[in-house]
């Protein structure tokens, strides 16, 4: 066969199937452009000049490149499999007319090659052309001001070509197996396979319900941030499995139940819609579940990153309680704490800064094992101790507690304490080791007051530092070199602009270093110094990077969702065309056909977005606690961001549904619109 004929056939096939190939190539270009942009930004030399947070931003961008690369594989394989299914009849005709499968393989190879060149080449051109604009957006989000020099990332270009060339090669191998293993008759009927009525898979439906319920239960009942972080991915996997199983098995069971209801089923619009969905539900369900999962990812990623960025000031206020923070771990807290305070105050005065607010706090924190309501001081590796039984006991003086948390604590007599927990402590006394303390008052620690607390931490308020001494000695005797020391924290707000506050903080750090106090880190004491104004840039850059990545990934997931919806509408249209033509021949009018179509596509395409919204609402408590680990305790802000994201995404989803429905109508009937 003339070698030039293969190329002509490949080009003509792409042109003939442009309705399928154009969206495929366009989204392929965008995916390539996204991937290159992430690599370009990650290797941008300008980021190396960031005064703070360069590693954080580069880590976020590197993570984004990995995520985009991973989903590119899934996305391109999905769209390729759809196109191949629609084209099996065409390839079967070629086979019957005399083309051998090796000839078909050459044509498919050239089609894949041309598609790869178009997608990779077009994507790289777009990525390079808009790279400077993307860099400007990133710099704006992280609050970085620097000159942006246009350049092409050679390593980014090479990595992009290698990845996507590999993906397209894998799709070619997949297509080759599809052709080689199929008989000519199977190719002719390949695009209409899957019409057998699926069986009701009760076990799959039950497993789906159980896994989804388990995922929801974890998300809703999680009671502390640490557990939320540990169980998040477990809950996600359970929800994904449950979603797919319920869509694939539960939906069929529901449709068959509706078919048994004669009063519902034997109506024109219900009869056609329900019977049509039953015969193709296995195929539909996988696509609809994918749309649901992708929609959920869009909602979670965008709402979380937007709320993190919008709540940056709250997060900084929770993380840094003063412009300058100095803490010391010591065995002699009063003497060394007073010396540290005096040195810091003197240095601030030397820098000509005024102290606006000053707060000092002394605490002693050590771990215990909860046994029958008592706290036992014992090493955790002893037999019988479990992580769920570990309680972190934090002792604090009454005066410091009132000042730090803006609460009122009643006067305490000898050995009396106030116990603050986030769970229900029922006893009127608390026993720690060999010491029992009467509880004058119990308080609940609420997350709504701007501070989040793990329910495995107890705050025990005492009169003075001297009241901490017995338990300090007790835990020191048990834990030895691993025992806790007193922890003195000093937070000071000063006047001045950002640069003056940074300079003052650096002066405090230098003064402490020159005093020789830091040399006590051999176990006697250890000093840590924090400068809020200086660290604010690092946080802003990291969270700005997360926001940029969230928007980028949100657009990518949305694009994949739109393409799946588009291909599904086309697939549904071609599969329904003959069926509705038969209905028209037996007496159904165009108007009745249109109503039937509307009922079917509404049922099919509104289900994923409704389910996605339910997933996100169920995940709200868990995501909120995970954000609390990052000091975002403003639940109302996250709720507003989540509701806003759901609203905007729903509008976009409905617009896409409306536009793709027109394509469906045009395929099914010329007069339906």
For the regions a protein language model found, what residue spans apply to each?
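N-terminal Sec/SRP start-transfer signal
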Residues: 1-32, 197-202, 211, 247-295, ...
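Short cytosolic juxtamembrane segments of multi-pass membrane proteins
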Residues: 3-8, 181-195, 574-575, 665-673
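Short helix-loop junctions at transmembrane helix boundaries
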Residues: 40-51, 55, 124-156, 213-231, ...
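Juxtamembrane interface at the cytosolic side of transmembrane helices
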Residues: 78, 86, 178, 224, ...
């Amino acid at each position: 066969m003339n070698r030039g004929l293969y190329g002509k056939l490949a080009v003509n096939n792409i042109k003939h199937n442009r309705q399928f190939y154009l969206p495929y190539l366009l989204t392929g270009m965008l995916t390539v452009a996204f991937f290159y942009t992430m690599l370009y930004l990650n290797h941008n030399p300008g980021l190396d000049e960031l005064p703070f947070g360069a590693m954080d931003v580069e880590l976020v961008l590197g993570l984004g490149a990995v995520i985009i690369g991973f989903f590119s594989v899934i996305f391109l394989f999905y769209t390729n499999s759809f196109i191949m299914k629609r084209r099996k009849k065409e390839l079967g005709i070629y086979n019957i007319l005399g083309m051998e499968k090796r000839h078909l393989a050459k044509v498919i190879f050239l089609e894949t090659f041309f598609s790869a060149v178009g997608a990779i080449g077009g994507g790289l051109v777009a990525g390079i052309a808009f790279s400077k604009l993307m860099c400007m957006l990133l710099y704006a989000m992280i609050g970085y001001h620097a000159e942006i020099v246009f350049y092409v990332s050679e390593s980014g270009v090479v990595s992009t070509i290698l990845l996507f060339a590999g993906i397209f090669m894998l799709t070619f191998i997949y297509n080759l197996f599809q052709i080689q293993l199929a008989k000519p008759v199977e190719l002719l009927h390949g695009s209409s396979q899957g019409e057998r009525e699926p069986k009701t898979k009760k076990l799959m439906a039950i497993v789906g319900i159980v896994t989804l319920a388990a995922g929801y239960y974890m998300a809703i009942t999680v009671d502390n941030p640490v557990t939320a972080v540990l169980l998040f991915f477990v809950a996600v996997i359970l929800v994904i499995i449950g979603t797919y199983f319920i869509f694939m098995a539960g939906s069929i069971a529901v449709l068959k139940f509706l078919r048994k209801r004669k009063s519902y089923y034997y109506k024109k619009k219900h009869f056609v819609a329900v019977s049509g969905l039953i015969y193709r539900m296995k195929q539909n369900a996988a696509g609809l579940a994918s749309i649901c999962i992708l929609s959920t990812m869009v909602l979670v990623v965008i709402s979380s990153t937007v709320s993190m960025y919008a709540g940056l000031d709250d997060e900084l206020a929770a993380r840094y309680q003063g412009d300058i923070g100095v803490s010391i771990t010591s065995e002699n807290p009063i003497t060394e704490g007073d010396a540290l305070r005096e040195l810091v105050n003197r240095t601030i005065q030397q820098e000509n800064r005024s102290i606006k607010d000053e707060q000092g706090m002394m605490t002693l924190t050590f771990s215990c094992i909860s046994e029958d309501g008592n706290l036992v001081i014992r090493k955790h590796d002893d037999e019988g101790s479990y992580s769920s039984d570990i309680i972190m006991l934090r002792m604090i003086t009454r005066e410091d507690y009132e000042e730090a948390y803006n609460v009122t604590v009643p006067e305490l007599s000898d050995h009396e304490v106030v116990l603050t927990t986030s769970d229900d402590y029922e006893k009127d006394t608390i026993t720690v080791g060999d010491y029992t303390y009467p509880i004058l008052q119990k308080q609940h620690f609420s997350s709504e007051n701007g501070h989040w607390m793990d329910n495995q931490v107890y705050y025990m308020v005492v009169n003075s530092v001297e009241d901490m001494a017995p338990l300090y000695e007790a835990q020191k005797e048990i834990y030895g070199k691993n025992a806790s020391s007193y922890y003195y924290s000093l937070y000071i707000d000063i006047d001045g602009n950002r640069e003056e506050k940074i300079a003052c903080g650096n002066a405090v750090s230098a003064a402490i270093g020159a005093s020789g106090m830091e040399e006590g880190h051999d176990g006697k004491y250890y000093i840590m110094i924090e400068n809020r104004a200086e660290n604010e840039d690092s946080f802003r850059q990291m969270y700005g990077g997360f926001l940029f990545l969230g928007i980028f990934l949100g657009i990518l997931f949305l694009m994949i969702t739109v393409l799946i919806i588009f291909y599904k509408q086309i697939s549904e249209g071609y599969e329904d065309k003959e069926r509705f033509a038969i209905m028209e021949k037996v007496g159904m009018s165009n108007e009745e056909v249109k109503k039937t179509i509307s009922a079917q596509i509404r049922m099919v395409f509104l289900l994923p977005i409704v389910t996605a919204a339910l997933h996100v609402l169920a995940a709200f408590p868990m995501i909120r606690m995970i954000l609390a680990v990052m000091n975002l305790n403003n639940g109302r802000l996250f709720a507003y961001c989540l509701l806003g994201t759901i609203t905007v995404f729903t509008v976009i989803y409905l617009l896409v549904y409306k536009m793709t429905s027109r394509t469906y109508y045009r395929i099914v009937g010329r007069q339906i619109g």
